[in-house]
Amino acid sequence: MKAGKHTLLKKFSTFAVAVSLSAGILAASAQPTEAATTYQVGKVTYAKDYKLDDGTTYFTVKGKFPQIKEDSGAAKKINQALTKEKNRVIRQWKTDSAEYKKDAEELKKEELTGSEYGDEITYKVYSNDENYFSVMLSGYVFLGGAHGTPYRSCLTFNAQTGEKLTAAKAFGISKKQLNQKVKKLYLDKYDKKGKEAGFFPGMNAKDGRKQLENNLKNMDFNNNFYVKNGKAVFYAEPYAVGPYAAGFISVSATIQ
């Protein structure tokens, strides 16, 4: 049984929300990640199996989250934001589990068998220098069907102050200017590579570009970015500007 469309939309749009950590298994690791060059980074893990009354597991979640192992003022601010994001994810899992339980109980009532739902998150630090600390949380949720759905949440900080940055703030421009800039980058990419870049194909090149313009019209990239090698990498979710197989189609711009 496939979950409703609103469930997936909720997964992307709310990515979300805080919860008591006693609901699952939480452990801090002392092992730093290879990416650490300025801040020493460890990981916090979380895992929980949601079960029916008869003990059948219907939803399994696993998460690995970053945590800076320093106590400077900037590090504390970054950790507060990282912890908030981690708790949002765990809270969302708890919220989703109630809906998924209904699916599992319905299948059981009809004496049908379905695939166990699952959601797993890992992280990767893309920048850890004197300018930026930028990390991506990458998730993959499986709710039955031919394949699951990938999603991500990125957080970028001023490494000196610990301030969480939007893309507009990083570039020193308005949110409107930022989105105009990014949308132009996508259109330029289409002009150079067309459907070879993974965009939805149109009836012809002109039709495909128009379709991309329409898809980009209401998209906001102010938080859909991470920093790598001094560049802001912006991304669009699967299906936003291209088919599932194209994944996260991205463009980048050097931060001046």
Which residue ranges define each predicted feature?
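Sec-dependent N-terminal signal peptides of Gram-positive bacterial secreted proteins and lipoproteins
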Residues: M1-E34
